[in-house]
Regions:
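Mid-domain alpha/beta scaffold segments of enzyme catalytic cores
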Residues: 1-318
């Protein structure tokens, strides 16, 4: 089973429609997968609930916040169940409080499994000017995450020192999930050593050949990794947008980096991985799948590990 720990299904459907695609959720999720869908405004969140209840779950009357895909069977062990989870947060690129009341209502009624995306984005001058507002909504969301004891899903670009500044508060949360982690193994280790129950979600940067992310996939603590597509975002060079099914290529390359290595590569990190020619820069997920050679046993070992991490990060239990 695959894990897509961060994606935007409503945006994906809209993107498909804008380029002449069907924009239907059935085909992208025809493979077994558990998902965490991220929303930033109430209309997007409500679309998620309708999309999955009607098209995937077949049960529009389900009262649960953890909607289980139609392939699941209730008596299966947790490791084999497929889940659709929802997160909601005020994004640092639009750090306004218009949706704060809606977010708090979701928290009070236990309709979401995490707060996020939240965090900081200092990627360009426009976003840097929003830093005071980003700090305000970040503080508010951390306070609520502690109050309701929910994980946070972190968006961070060029702002990791600000996240480190919040370590005393992050330590009080059940889990901290770094969406689209692009940092180094050393930075990731630092969060863990400081007592943060952190998970690091790896996306299509492993297909772009981003050295630090490939090093994470290759040799970082296996109990701390997740996988994602961020669909329809995080596209590769030859792709108009990302598909949810790209999680298959992300997973294959992560497993490839982790298992198709010599013992010397295992011990010496990203430089050795690159020298061993395991790191590749693919222009599309399709091209990646055509080239990656990894046996099914290795894929299963890797996905079983990611499923366990997903369940732990989001507090799922039988």
């Amino acid at each position: 089973m695959y894990i897509d720990a961060h994606l935007h299904p409503a945006d994906y459907c809209d993107t498909c429609a804008s380029v002449g695609g069907a924009g239907n959720v059935d085909e992208p999720f025809a493979y077994p997968a558990s998902l965490c869908c991220s929303a930033h405004d109430h209309t997007e969140y409500e679309r998620y609930r309708r999309l999955f209840e009607r098209n995937v779950c077949g049960d529009a009357n389900s009262p649960t916040t953890e909607i289980v895909l139609h392939q699941s069977v209730s008596h299966l062990p947790l490791s084999e169940k497929q889940h659709i989870l929802f997160s909601f947060g005020i994004h640092p690129q639009n750090p306004v409080t218009d949706e704060a009341e809606f977010l708090y209502r979701l928290l009070e009624t236990r309709q979401i499994h995490a707060i996020g995306e939240c965090g900081f984005d200092l990627f360009n001058d426009e976003y840097k000017q929003l830093l005071p507002m980003q700090q305000t909504v970040w503080d508010m969301q951390l306070r609520w995450a502690q109050e309701f004891q929910l994980p946070v899903v972190i968006h961070c670009r060029k702002a990791l020192p600000l996240i480190f500044d919040s370590v005393p508060r992050l330590k009080k949360l059940p889990a901290v999930i770094f969406h689209g982690w692009g940092g180094s193994p050393q930075e990731a280790t630092s969060f863990l050593k400081k007592g943060v129950n952190a998970y690091f979600s790896l996306g299509k940067a492993v297909l772009r050949g981003q050295k630090s992310v490939c090093a994470m996939a290759a040799s970082f603590d296996s109990t701390r990794l997740l996988t994602e597509t961020d669909a329809p975002y995080m596209r590769l060079k030859a792709e108009p947008y990302s598909h949810p099914r790209d999680i298959i290529a992300v997973t294959a390359q992560c497993a490839n980096l982790r298992y198709n290595r010599t013992d010397s590569v295992k011990q010496t990190g990203s430089d050795a991985v690159k020298r061993a020619c395991v790191i590749k820069q693919y222009e599309s997920s399709t091209a990646a799948l055509e080239e990656i050679s990894i046996d099914e046993a290795a894929i299963k070992e890797f996905t079983d590990m990611i499923v366990r991490n997903f369940n732990c990060a989001f507090g799922l239990s039988d």
